[in-house]
Amino acid sequence: MSQQGPIIVVSSAERPPFASALDEAKLFPVIDTNWADASRAVAQLAPAAVLVASPVAAEPGLDALARQIAATIPYLPLIAVDPVTALPANAIPFTQTGGNFDRLVARLRAALRVRTLHSTLLRRLDGDPAARAALDDTDPARDATVLLIGRGAGYPSLSVALGERMGVVGALSLEAAAKHLNVRDIDGIVLGEGFSPRVEDAFLTVLAEDARFRNLPVVLTSGALAPAYDLPNLEILSGEPAAVAANALPLIRQHAFETHLGRMLKSIEAGGLLDSRTGLLAPAAFNLDFVTAVSQTLAHGGGLSVARFAFDPDHPRAQLDGARILSRLMRQIDFGAAESDGSVIVVFAETDLRTAHAISRRLSSVMR
């Protein structure tokens, strides 16, 4: 993979073992530096990624380095290997290495794909300063959705800690979780207490075997299993709910950012007809399509039905989640748009009123 720049490894002592693993994976050039020179190296070398070997004690330069990296465009991944202290908000933790860094290489490749996607979008937006400014102001965590699975005593506290940072969808069973994964845009999974190691192992195995979910951030809050799965963004994080949520956020934010970039690219390819946040039509495009559909139905006959899904305008997140679910579940012949009053309008082509009622009820049941 061409990473469009070197990989900088920051450490306070001798060269960390994972740097050699990067060499063996042919992710070069790999440049070693210490904390005193790290900021200058990032500024001068324009790296594709920065990996830090977390020191035993808190490193005062980490926060400043993280702020510098967060302001870098295009997206610059920052990965902290085996951290022992609290991390900045944009530092992705990588723990439980056990001397095997294959999963680190896979995680780095996944992060580099996000960087490449960001670079591609920036090229497409060249000459459109308004769209570029909107992208730069995007907060991926604001629209992120995490699937919290569990039924143990720590579930309520973990739900609150995650909910303070992003949207949360709860599931008390793995069966309910599977349904959410199939109908919602999920940016990460947190697997809490309440399941045996055998059940957890089966769930992780299924995720690893499904290409749709393989790159999802997955956080285990118990240490009963080793991270020996083909899941590059699998983390085992134990501790207080607030610490688990804080350490899970960077991985989830990265996935949400990747999804947002993909939607924006699709919108550009569609000539700006799609809303990059929801995947539905932009309002102007919807109005044009609706007028055309009505005219054709009046001229040639057939069925045409319209459904309005109302959401609380004081909670715009509900409309966003509902719109994304609808964009995933609608038939290809249907189209819709999110309206400014908090509702979502969907047009069912070639559909009579009775069938439209049945479809709308099914869609509503999923969005509850």
Task: Please annotate each region the language model reported.
Residues V9-V30, R151-L174:
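Two-component/phosphorelay signaling modules centered on CheY-like receiver
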Residues R15, T33-S39, A48-Y75, P83-V84, ...:
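Conserved phosphotransfer microenvironments
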Residues S20, A58-I73, P77-D102, A106, ...:
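Alpha4 helix (beta4-alpha4-beta5 surface) of REC/receiver domains from two-component response regulators
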Residues N90-A91, T97-R132, A243-S267, D289, ...:
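Receiver (REC) domain switch/output surface
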Residues T145-V146, L280, G302-P313, G336:
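Active-site-flanking beta-strand signature of metal-NTP-handling nucleotidyl enzymes
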Residues R263-P283:
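Amphipathic HAMP/coiled-coil signal-transducing linker helices
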Residues A270, L281-G302, D321-R331:
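Short regulatory alpha-helical coupling segments
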Residues L273, A299, D321-A356, S365-R368:
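Conserved helix-loop-beta segment at the catalytic/binding core of cyclic-nucleotide signaling proteins
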